[in-house]
Design a protein with these regions (language model features):
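Extended, folded domain segments that form the structural surfaces/walls around functional sites
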Residues: 1-2, 34
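Electrostatic cytochrome c docking/interface patches
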Residues: 3-23, 56
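Gly/Gly-Pro-rich "capping" loops immediately C-terminal to redox-active cysteine motifs
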Residues: 19-20, 29-65, 70, 74
Length: 93
């Protein structure tokens, strides 16, 4: 079950934490385009176009995919869940 450890966190806090991870500790913006984050990199998929769901993002971030490195052990489970939440919502906007 995702977000099990984040039950006390509001949706806004989760979104903001996810954006912070996307831009900073996860360094996602270095490779992925996502309008909400102001990132326009095109090394990885354009997240605005593919609009990945939360589970797909969690799997990709944890395990890596293609040239994207696995972030399990680098990011905490909470950070992975937050960035997945943020990315799935921001990509829909």
């Amino acid at each position: 079950m995702i977000f099990s450890s984040l039950t006390q966190v509001t949706a806004d806090e989760l979104f903001n934490k996810g954006k912070e991870v996307f831009l900073e500790s996860g360094n996602c913006a270095a490779c992925h385009m996502l309008s909400d984050a102001g990132s326009n990199a095109m090394v990885g998929p354009n997240l605005n176009e593919i609009r990945p769901d939360i589970q797909r993002i969690i799997m990709a971030v944890r395990n890596g995919i293609g040239v994207m490195p696995a972030m399990e052990g680098i990011l905490s489970d909470e950070e992975i869940e937050a960035v997945a939440h943020y990315t799935s919502i921001a990509a829909e906007q």
